[in-house]
Amino acid sequence: MDITFIDETEKVPTEEIKEIENLLQFAAGFLEIAEDTEMSVTFTDNAGIQMINRDYRGKDMPTDVISFALEDEGEDELPIIFDDEELAELPRNLGDLIISTERAAEQAVEYGHTLEREMGFLAVHGFLHLNGYDHMEPEDEKEMFGLQKEILDAYGLKR
């Protein structure tokens, strides 16, 4: 899977980005995602994610992670239509993850675990959203959170 990383904070160590990439590659293998799949991960601060949260979700407050799944159509969006031949030539693009490193650090302290664990959790959580999982209904939440724990535990990133 091809993952593009953008660090708007210019503070995320290269080793941490590599670790998140390894975790997301592991999660992609776990879900049997095709190798020619693409996605992006952007690291921002609370002000940056608050602006995105306000503009796209109508919530004027910072949050930890936002996922923009390209395969999900919004209510007022028209579908992008390709014929099968065109579609076969294009890599699958899951979409974009935006993670607030500030919020991740705050939550790591709140939950009593490492920043590495919190960043990994948020990356996998957002990755599952990009792949169609959600937690709006109790049964969906159970499935998504169970899968999230399974991936993190199998990778070795436990609480």
Swiss-Prot record:
Superkingdom of the organism of origin: Bacteria
Listed Pfam families: YbeY
Top-rank EC class of the record's enzyme: hydrolase
Listed GO MF terms: metalloendopeptidase activity; RNA endonuclease activity; zinc ion binding
Record-linked SUPFAM superfamilies: Metalloproteases ('zincins'), catalytic domain
EC id: 3.1.-.-
Subcellular location: Cytoplasm
Cofactor: binding comment: Binds 1 zinc ion.
One of the GO BP terms on file: rRNA processing
GO CC field: cytoplasm
Alphabetically ordered keywords of this record: Cytoplasm, Endonuclease, Hydrolase, Metal-binding, Nuclease, Ribosome biogenesis, rRNA processing, Zinc
Residues annotated for Zn(2+) binding in this entry: H125, H129, H135
Cofactor: Zn(2+)
Similarity annotation: Belongs to the endoribonuclease YbeY family.
Role according to the record: Single strand-specific metallo-endoribonuclease involved in late-stage 70S ribosome quality control and in maturation of the 3' terminus of the 16S rRNA.
Name the UniProt record assigns to this protein: Endoribonuclease YbeY
Lineage, opening ranks: Bacteria, Bacillati, Bacillota, Bacilli, Lactobacillales
UniProt gene name: ybeY
